[in-house]
Amino acid sequence: MDRGRCANMLKSLQRTLAKCQKSPSTNHWQCFKRNFTSIRATKYPGRSNSTFHYWPWFAASTLLATSLYYRDRPVQNDDKTDAFPSHTESIQVDSSVSDFPLTITALNFPVSTTFKLLGYGQRHVTFLRFKVYALGLYLAENDENLVSDTLNETYLHKYFLDVDDSKTPKENLARLLKRDDSKSVMMIDDLLDSGMRMLAKITPVRNTDFKHLKEGLVKTISKHPDVANNKDTLAKGLSELNDAFSRKGSVRKNDDLIIELLANGALQFSYHDSKNNEFEVMGVVNNQLVGKFLFSQYLCGEKSPSPQAKKTTIDKLITLL
């Protein structure tokens, strides 16, 4: 092979790569395809005096094109806990439904403030091992400071004796949140009592109905460890939940149930018909235990409906300590 021609070929490819990386367009793969067609093809002699047309160009360009192509592919997160990519506006929670937005605002959903994604995962039916819905858990943007204001060094030494003095307060709090189910429930419940606003986005991965969604919420709430001490109050709250979920009928795959935890502890339920892009505010549950127990189960404890969503959410909360 002519080394001079090979060197020129590589220089041309390097110039193409640099040009596409600096392109204002976000799709570097399309940029490469446009520019590569203008590069002059060259012949190189092969073995036994035969001639291979363009093969060095093809090999090198394939490597380059593959790099650019996968650089522009959307992020996929089925059963993964990767950090949120900073350059995207959404993330794939499950491949069978639409990506979840990293930010939810009153401009695109019937919510009271701006929410940022904390964590995500899927809900599985344990004994059958099939997925039921994708779940995203969000925190009000203006309430991020409540995490460090509530779970701080003073809180740590006031309520816990097993503090490792060789660790920082943040490391001790992180250990308790991640490794001690009973203490994590106490910590998350105190955090929710601070008035922290949250939001859950539930997107079915198969066709279902409002009855099944409501039953799932009731089961999740009923698994909170403090239910036995609050039976009467919670019973009234579940009655409110039943009224808020009075709508009947089917819920299509990829529709959304939006559950907003308000500052006063109330829950607002909204439904998004994704096919027609229509929203409906279904109702409000004012009983504070319902909202507190529901989001507590999402965030902590051994009976969380989505361990993946719990893990990714706790990991994100720890960064806010």
UniProtKB/Swiss-Prot annotation:
- Please name the Pfam families in this protein's record: Chalcone_2
Q: Which InterPro entries match?
A: Chalcone_isomerase, Chalcone_isomerase_3-sand, Chalcone_isomerase_sf
Q: Which UniProt keywords apply?
A: Mitochondrion, Transit peptide
What are the protein's GO molecular function terms? intramolecular lyase activity
Task: Look up the domain of life of the source.
Answer: Eukaryota
Transit sequence range: 1-72
The keyword S-adenosyl-L-methionine is assigned to this record:
no
Principal place of residence: mitochondrion
The family note in this entry says: Belongs to the AIM18/AIM46 family.
Protein name per UniProt? Altered inheritance of mitochondria protein 18, mitochondrial
Q: What gene does the UniProt entry assign to this protein? A: AIM18
